[in-house]
């Protein structure tokens, strides 16, 4: 195995430490698992052209206008979206269907909106 050095935000490290204490694993094992998950997900996403899925977005009310505008720009892949207020934030579930690159582009633009805390893509392949 190779050794690497890593610099992360203090808050993120605190969250990692909470997880590793619950899971009873080392930081190294946690990071190894996270990297394996990311690589597998990236590899899987890169091999499939057409997808159907859902994007979960968590944000505050400042982002509503930007998200609605972005959805209209991607109406070729957005099937429907549902907005749910929850504990002072908004959770939006966006059903999507289309080409992989277009979906990834849309997801990345959602992530780029300043008031968006999370934009998580979940997809399945269309055979």
UniProtKB/Swiss-Prot annotation:
InterPro entries: Acetolactate_synth/TF_NikR_C, ACT-like_dom_sf, Arc_rbn_hlx_hlx, CopG, CopG/NikR_regulator, Ribbon_hlx_hlx, TF_NikR_Ni-bd_C. The keyword NADP does not apply. SUPFAM superfamilies: ACT-like (SSF55021), Ribbon-helix-helix (SSF47598). Signal peptide: none annotated. It comes from the Archaea. PANTHER family: NICKEL-RESPONSIVE REGULATOR. It comes from Methanocaldococcus jannaschii (strain ATCC 43067 / DSM 2661 / JAL-1 / JCM 10045 / NBRC 100440). GO terms for molecular function: DNA binding. Belongs to the transcriptional regulatory CopG/NikR family. Pfam families: NikR_C, RHH_1. This is Uncharacterized transcriptional regulator MJ0080. GO terms for biological process: regulation of DNA-templated transcription. Keywords: DNA-binding, Transcription, Transcription regulation.
